[in-house]
Amino acid sequence: MEEMLRQKIEDAADPLRTALLYARAGNYIDFGAMNEVNENTFLSLLDSVPFRPEDEPVMESFFKACEKAERFLLITDNCGEIVLDKLFLEQLKKRYPALQLQVLVRGQEVLNDAIEEDASYTGMDQLAEILSNGLPLAGTVYERLPEKAREAMDRADVILAKGQGNYETLSHQGRHIFYSFLCKCELFTERFRVLPLTGVFAEENG
């Protein structure tokens, strides 16, 4: 399936934008939040995730930030979706070859979140430096991060955090962070006033 998805991305009019949307759709692969993860549902979501009009300026802001950036940090969520995250990083590196890529994963197994072993298994370590948050926590708590992970967050010109857990633990703390996730629980569908499995791109400017 990875090669099929890569080809669909390559064939798209804008491969980077498509890869970013696919990576967001990959947030569906969450055995911690979903009662059932269905392959057909996932494949249908790739090209049909409900798109909020307010996401468009966020995406434009994201791409403009990447154009000027030297360091990019991706904070991952579920292990199942990091193959799509890797495909996104491939396109990001093609568009901005000088961009230094880092990926922050969970430090220990928690729910079905990605750890260093998962990132290496997918080959993501061939594209980016893989960092551990040192914690078995379904989110990212800056104050509890090891020094190298804190330094990566402090030095990154662009941060993209995936998933609801990262949004809950990182938002409203005065940092400039882009967020990408599907709304999979009532808390998020009510907060963003959307239907279940609606995709969200959000930006906090600090």
What is each residue range found by the language model?
Residues I29-E54, K68-R71, Q108-E116, Y121-L127, ...:
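Conserved catalytic alpha/beta core of Sir2/sirtuin-type deacylases, generalized to analogous enzyme cores
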Residues N78-P97, Q102:
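Histidine-anchored nucleotide/phosphate-binding helix
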Residues V105-G107, E117-G206:
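C-terminal functional extensions of proteins
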Residues S61-A65, I75, F88-Q91, K148, ...:
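Short, hydrophobic/aromatic alpha-helical segments in well-folded domains
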Residues R71-L73, D157-V158:
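Structural motif
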Residues E70-R71, A98-Q102, H176:
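Residues at the starts of beta-strands that form the adenosine-phosphate
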Residues D77-K86, Q108-V110, Q164-E168:
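Gly/Ser/Thr-rich loops at beta-strand to alpha-helix junctions
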Residues M1-A69:
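Electropositive, gly/pro-rich neighborhoods at or near active sites that engage anionic ligands
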